[in-house]
């Protein structure tokens, strides 16, 4: 009996092992080199332990193969992925061969029935739907429209200063949480600009908006578990769909959108004139043109909201980190800002006239890219060369991983890559040159470049102008000294958080 039991157990274990490794020869059969995958975790050894950020696993592979191949085959658990090693090939994926890599991988994991809001975000949309939605949204994010809401930016900047001054009066040995402060700023900004409502983020009794935003972005285990299941058993992706926007968060924003729409329509019906042509105004016009209900209006408005909250706050917090660590850079920036101030504020047109500020933004994005990698989906098979290896075909449906972090932290392209050196971006068209080489894609590239890039940049610059012109930024001892990323986060951030000591000038 014992022998029979052991035999059955051995057969089951053997069968399970065979199932788990059955396609690990996928890339070898196609002549594509790459590291040997490990059971369950594939080429992401920290998938389960989360001892370090996943991008470091990819960086190890990148450095192992960068001088030999343009791309190598890897596995996310059992799912084959093509890891792009050559930045020139990365640019082909985003630009010249865009039609072959049109969609983002997440599109195959999102279903409109289970996650209507995120499924209708341009990031998730595919094919003609993406093209139509982007064409609809783009006119709402022109520089002209961003300029009309700039007075809101100045108003929120004033609230930011008042909040910081209050924190300084209260005092804390841990200093100020830079991410929390930045998220208060972006939540207040975006809520007013997009919905015409106040979030009261800087008050003692904020509305639930910011907590709902935190609920939206602070769910790493949801995505890790989903990734593990669908990567280990790819067929499950047809049965299990990822829900990025939790039900309660969607319900909250649907109600909020309804309230914003009713309020604005009532104001317009009463004959109230608005000095600004804001994003809500544009969404309402689009709604009438497309005959959209509140849920559909929210799907459009969430495009503006998602691009403006978390990623913008993350970049802002890390700029303050870098300036706090680099006193000379902070002083140079303060000098540049003060030379353009008028009555304590800066004109909208002058924001683009601050080259050192722009360089600080770009260099921070290089060091702490919010989008540390892009997972593209091959939408049309294509043959590509591979340096020392033979040409091979990337088949339709293959996931193609572009590791932006690896390029931007490579000493070959950026000497002394871990150091904050804004001067890298002071050369004429430096960012454009780096982008065309494929080594710097802070906002992506090609037709699917980040649609909220200009709005986010204006927010970030305005906040930095406000803070650096009025406060000296120092790093609290609670903040780590290196640039190690927090494991398991959707958007990269310094491990342990960023804590600042601010001094009023």
Swiss-Prot record:
Signal peptide per UniProt: none
Keyword annotations: Endoplasmic reticulum, Heme, Iron, Membrane, Metal-binding, Microsome, Monooxygenase, Oxidoreductase
Any one GO CC term of the record: endoplasmic reticulum membrane
Record GO terms (molecular function): heme binding; iron ion binding; monooxygenase activity; oxidoreductase activity, acting on paired donors, with incorporation or reduction of molecular oxygen
Gene3D superfamilies for the chain: Cytochrome P450
Domain of life: Eukaryota
UniProt-listed Enzyme Commission number(s): 1.14.-.-
Cofactor(s) essential for the protein: heme
Localization (cell): Endoplasmic reticulum membrane; Microsome membrane
InterPro entries reported for this sequence: Cyt_P450 (IPR001128), Cyt_P450_CS (IPR017972), Cyt_P450_E_grp-IV (IPR002403), Cyt_P450_sf (IPR036396), Insect_CytP450_Detox (IPR050476)
Membrane topology: Peripheral membrane protein
Binding site for heme: 450
Protein family membership: Belongs to the cytochrome P450 family.
Function: May be involved in the metabolism of insect hormones and in the breakdown of synthetic insecticides.
Protein name according to UniProt: Probable cytochrome P450 28a5
Organism: Drosophila melanogaster
């Amino acid at each position: 009996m014992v022998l029979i039991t052991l035999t059955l157990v051995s057969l089951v274990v053997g069968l399970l092992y065979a199932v788990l490794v059955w396609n690990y020869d996928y890339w070898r059969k196609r002549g594509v080199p790459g590291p040997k995958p490990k059971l369950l975790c594939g080429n992401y050894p920290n998938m389960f332990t989360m001892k370090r950020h996943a991008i470091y696993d990819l960086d190890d592979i990148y450095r192992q193969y960068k001088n030999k191949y343009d791309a190598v085959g890897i596995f996310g658990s059992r799912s084959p992925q093509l890891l792009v090693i050559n930045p020139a090939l990365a640019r082909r994926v985003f630009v010249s061969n865009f039609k072959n890599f049109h969609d983002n991988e997440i599109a195959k994991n999102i279903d409109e029935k289970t996650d209507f809001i995120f499924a209708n975000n341009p990031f998730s949309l595919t094919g003609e739907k993406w093209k139509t939605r982007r064409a609809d949204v783009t006119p709402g994010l022109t520089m002209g429209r961003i300029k009309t809401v700039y007075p809101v930016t100045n108003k929120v900047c004033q609230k930011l200063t008042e909040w910081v001054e209050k924190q300084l009066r209260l005092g804390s040995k841990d200093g100020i949480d830079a991410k929390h402060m930045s998220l208060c700023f972006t939540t207040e900004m975006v809520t007013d600009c997009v919905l015409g409502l106040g979030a009261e983020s800087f008050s003692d009794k904020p509305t639930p908006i910011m907590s709902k935003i935190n609920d939206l972005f602070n769910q790493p285990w949801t995505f890790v578990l989903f990734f593990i299941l669908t990567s280990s058993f790819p067929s499950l992706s047809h049965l299990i769909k990822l829900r990025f926007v939790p039900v309660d968060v969607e319900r909250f924003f649907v109600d909020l959108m309804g309230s914003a729409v009713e309020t604005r329509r009532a104001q317009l019906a009463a004959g109230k004139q608005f000095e600004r042509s804001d994003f809500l105004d544009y969404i309402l016009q689009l709604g009438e043109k497309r005959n959209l209900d509140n849920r559909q209006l929210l799907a459009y408005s969430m495009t503006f909201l998602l691009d403006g909250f978390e990623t913008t706050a993350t970049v802002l917090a890390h700029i303050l980190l870098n300036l706090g660590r680099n006193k000379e850079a902070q002083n140079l920036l303060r000098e540049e800002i003060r030379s353009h101030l008028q009555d304590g504020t800066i004109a909208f047109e002058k924001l683009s006239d601050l080259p050192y500020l722009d360089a600080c933004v770009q260099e921070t994005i290089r060091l702490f890219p919010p989008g540390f990698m892009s997972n593209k989906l091959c939408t049309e098979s294509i043959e590509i060369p591979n340096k020392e290896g033979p040409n091979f075909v990337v088949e339709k449906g293959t996931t193609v991983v572009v590791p932006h972090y690896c390029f931007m932290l490579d000493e070959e392209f950026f000497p002394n890559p871990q150091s904050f050196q804004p001067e890298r971006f002071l050369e004429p068209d430096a960012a454009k040159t780096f982008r065309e080489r494929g080594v710097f894609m802070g906002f992506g590239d090609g037709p699917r470049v980040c649609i909220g890039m200009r709005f986010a940049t204006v927010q970030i610059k305005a906040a930095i102008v406000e803070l650096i012109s009025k406060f000296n930024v120092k790093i609290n001892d609670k903040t780590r000294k290196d640039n190690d990323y927090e494991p398991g986060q959707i958007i990269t951030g310094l491990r342990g958080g960023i804590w600042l000591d601010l001094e009023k000038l």
